[in-house]
Amino acid sequence: MSYNYVVTAQKPTAVNGCVTGHFTSAEDLNLLIAKNTRLEIYVVTAEGLRPVKEVGMYGKTAVMELFRPKGESKDLLFILTAKYNACILEYKQNGDNIDIITRAHGNVQDRIGRPSETGIIGIIDPECRMIGLRLYDGLFKVIPLDRENKELKAFNIRLEELQVIDVKFLYGCQAPTICFVYQDPQGRHVKTYEVSLREKEFNKGPWKQENVEAEASMVIAVPEPFGGAIIIGQESITYHNGDKYLAIAPPIIKQSTIVCHNRVDPNGSRYLLGDMEGRLFMLLLEKEEQMDGTVTLKDLRVELLGETSIAECLTYLDNGVVFVGSRLGDSQLVKLNVDSNEQGSYVVAMETFTNLGPIVDMCVVDLERQGQGQLVTCSGAFKEGSLRIIRNGIGIHEHASIDLPGIKGLWPLRSDSHREMDNMLVLSFVGQTRVLMLNGEEVEETELTGFVDDQQTFFCGNVAHQQLIQITSASVRLVSQEPKALVSEWKEPNGKNISVASCNSNQVVVAVGRALYYLEIRPQELRQINCTEMEHEVACLDITPLGDTNGMSPLCAIGLWTDISARILKLPSFELLHKEMLGGEIIPRSILMTTFESSHYLLCALGDGALFYFGLSLETGLLSDRKKVTLGTQPTVLRTFRSLSTTNVFACSDRPTVIYSSNHKLVFSNVNLKEVNYMCPLNSDGYPDSLALANNSTLTIGTIDEIQKLHIRTVPLYESPRKICYQEVSQCFGVLSSRIEVQDASGGTTALRPSASTQALSSSVSTSKLFSSSTAPHETSFGEEVEVHNLLIIDQHTFEVLHAHQFLQNEYALSLVSCKLGKDPNTYFIVGTAMVYPEEAEPKQGRIVVFHYSDGKLQSLAEKEVKGAVYSMVEFNGKLLASINSTVRLYEWTAEKELRTECNHYNNIMALYLKTKGDFILVGDLMRSVLLLAYKPMEGNFEEIARDFNPNWMSAVEILDDDNFLGAENAFNLFVCQKDSAATTDEERQHLQEVGLSHLGEFVNVFCHGSLVMQNLGETSTPTQGSVLFGTVNGMIGLVTSLSESWYNLLLDMQNRLNKVIKSVGKIEHSFWRSFHTERKTEPATGFIDGDLIESFLDISRPKMQEVVANLQIDDGSGMKREATVDDLIKIVEELTRIH
């Protein structure tokens, strides 16, 4: 068996459907967006879209339509999933609770039937008498809409027109009437039928039209007064209603194909049309009033409004605002203006919604060397193509920033005794101190009576008895708040300079070299209580009061130079309670006592970014449980701040980190800032609950996220990225991309728009000795689109395109790797290509090209001709492994810098994917699942170890460990195969057993090892091993990790219990949704835990949690079982959420 846990790190972002209507109430205008398995419900307000609820469906949304049957006060929602689960949903609000009620449900799958090539079509009769579905060729399925019916029952009507392209119900018909475009050997035609519910048959329709445009693809039913239907083709738009026929062929729509439409006015006089290039059109129906008062159609007109994201769906909201849902790029809210701008566009983007889909390729890199992966994806396509940099962390939202270099410390201050909020910020510099006054959001420099400004401040703050304190290198100064005046000053008896200081509201400890002085703060007096001498100089100290000690700390923590130790001293006596040798050469730079979740800790940060932390006993001063983590590479400064009424520690360094506690374990979270030298909390009128942060050049004031989440940065390419790899030595990414060019009259081609490959800092073009120009058998014609492929070299810091290398005409770049080969010290970018001609079934020629990038120049060092397409390449033990059509081939890199074939393996249909580990090679085939090869270095050949004999059409593969192999296939399933080394017969050993099966509901394009969270920081008890990330067509990022058998069994038990407690939307069984399902077979899921379901435990109410836990047995750690509590499960699930 194989035990795995699959969970979503980023929910799908590609929009595949949107509708508008009155779903939450009769008054609300709602926008409903389908993102594969997620349904998002918004209310349209004057300020924009307000999210109301997000629903996870147990299915891929194939049809989503709002309708209002007679007697209903608001709209109901009909949904059909890809596995044919149909349901009617209603929105119910009880106080703060929002429920999506399933009014009716059922599965409408047929046992036999060929799913139509044009996909699932679902339509609702305008009078709400029935729902029509076109699922299979030659059948039209009808679901009658009776109010009482809880179960959706359907019947089929035979359709002799097998190839239906699109179908709609017409308006204003006595009986429900469908109008459809279909194809037969003669061409495409339009036909109508009446649907008889009683006879369960079609009756002859009111009209038909034979031989419409050969590319006619969409039917739009027009409401009354016009009635009838509009048929949209590639070149023409026609209107039919039986009596009237009107056709127009506007040249502007020919350039591309119209893919979506939406009605603007209820009477159907205007329609929005969107095409594949992202252009938005308005179709206008001009009316003519007849003598008898009826209205007929006079003319059709199409106007180009402007450009949007490439639309998958459009919906008109209100007041000229349109939602553009996109699958290939970011979705948008756009405003349609009455007047055009300088570019002639009527469209203005108001808001953009990030979409990572389709993720075509991705790589995990640790760009900032901080032990945390960032994911860089090739996202989007055509003009929406981009790179997305995704990292997990805590965001800081900047509210103000001031250029102020050289800050050495900062503190908030309340200058008057009656103030609740901070109104000043004290900044320390070498040799001087400045005070900033905060007035609302305004910041101006000011002076404070009693403060000195010509010395560096070590500490400043509000202290007991309505006083302020300033500790500088020369003295400790106590200043009264009313009136502001110096009331007491303490200097070192011999006039030496203070080197380190710490202060709380009642106590001060300062260090002068090796001497320590302890002072107490009284009204208008600083009283020296004690002093002592340490054996080495003091590097850092802290007297933060912990527990309920009335603001007095009984302990003082210090870090010393020379012997590199941390010590706990008792106050006021300076008695040594504990001495901890930290080891190494690097001195402690910052020390802090703090309390997390009522446990006390000592944190001590060194000058190289290392952090030690210990449990601390307040009574004895003893340290326990020593642990160490690395937070950065530079000296770290520790400061506490409060957020959500819990204490957190901010570690300032080149890798700023927030430290907090969860389930009594310390958690370290990245902050999404480059570097922070100093910080302090700030709570002023203009900047409530904020942080002030200083780096080398700037002071920033901002608020901090309460939780860790994925942050996404976009680098637009305006063309399609295909493959990405990272090259550390040159600090660059290599990206394969393609742009579309159009053949012009002179025989050359021109780019449609500026994009990454045409705007690079430098560029080069392939010339090849391998292929003479006469090899191109294919002549392109005027106006034809051609793909131009490039290798882009992109800087890892600025993401600037440093170089673009263009491949040959008709040459498609398919695979990319950055690696060293043999004993050659250079690192190369290697690209695999194919010569693609329309008349060839599969490519017969291709190249492997070896590039070297250094000093801003890209050189092509070697090229190797191959007889086919180079689908995949990986570095393999210092050699190059490539899959070419059906062959897996290993190349050596010779001293002459040439690729020489070492061995081949031929037993595949089409070897698309390669992954390696040690001497093992996993091959993913187009249709023959996966195969495991071993390379025999002594014999210099491949041996076929085992294969999966199930026919799976693969979309991506990955090696989990030595024995387990992960695959994704084209029916949206995941499976794990296992090598059976213990099998007794050879035949059994040659079979890879399918030990894990699950339906993901997403098309996976890429797997890669890596993680989005800080690795091995702090303590973890997550029971998971390894981490494989995957990216999908819908922009979802997921994670697969392995479990032990005992954890799998516990989580499986929990999963089954959750399924009884959590009611699914649409009453779809979880077991049905996750069952492995292809055209050949359906099998129950096994070997996979649904992490999304497990994590939903944290969102249910306490009584429901109690239901899940009832009689659940867990291990008590000593091998005995005990009954689990709700808190046990919360802890376990919270641990699991932390892996992504």
From Swiss-Prot:
Pathway per the UniProt entry: Protein modification; protein ubiquitination
Region WD repeat beta-propeller C, residue ranges: 709-1043
Entry keywords, A to Z: Biological rhythms, Cytoplasm, DNA damage, DNA repair, DNA-binding, Nucleus, Repeat, Ubl conjugation pathway
Record flagged with keyword Zinc: no
Gene Ontology terms, MF aspect: DNA binding
Main localization of the protein described in the UniProt heading: cytoplasm
Residue intervals passing through the bilayer: none
Subcellular location(s) per record: Cytoplasm; Nucleus
Pfam families in alphabetical order: Beta-prop_RSE1_1st (PF10433), Beta-prop_RSE1_2nd (PF23726), CPSF_A (PF03178)
Annotated spans, WD repeat beta-propeller B: 391-708
Region (WD repeat beta-propeller A) location: 13-356
GO cellular component: Cul4-RING E3 ubiquitin ligase complex; Cul4A-RING E3 ubiquitin ligase complex; Cul4B-RING E3 ubiquitin ligase complex; cytoplasm; nucleoplasm; nucleus; site of double-strand break
One GO term of the biological process aspect: protein ubiquitination
Similarity comment: family membership: Belongs to the DDB1 family.
Cited function: Protein, which is both involved in DNA repair and protein ubiquitination, as part of the UV-DDB complex and DCX (DDB1-CUL4-X-box) complexes, respectively. Core component of the UV-DDB complex (UV-damaged DNA-binding protein complex), a complex that recognizes UV-induced DNA damage and recruit proteins of the nucleotide excision repair pathway (the NER pathway) to initiate DNA repair. The UV-DDB complex may recognize UV-induced DNA damage and recruit proteins of the nucleotide excision repair pathway (the NER pathway) to initiate DNA repair.
Oligomeric and partner information: Component of the UV-DDB complex which includes DDB1 and DDB2. Component of numerous DCX (DDB1-CUL4-X-box) E3 ubiquitin-protein ligase complexes which consist of a core of DDB1, CUL4A or CUL4B and RBX1, and a substrate receptor, such as CRBN. DDB1 may recruit specific substrate targeting subunits to the DCX complex. These substrate targeting subunits are generally known as DCAF (DDB1- and CUL4-associated factor) or CDW (CUL4-DDB1-associated WD40-repeat) proteins.
Domain remarks: The core of the protein consists of three WD40 beta-propeller domains.
Name this polypeptide is given: DNA damage-binding protein 1
Species for this entry: Gallus gallus
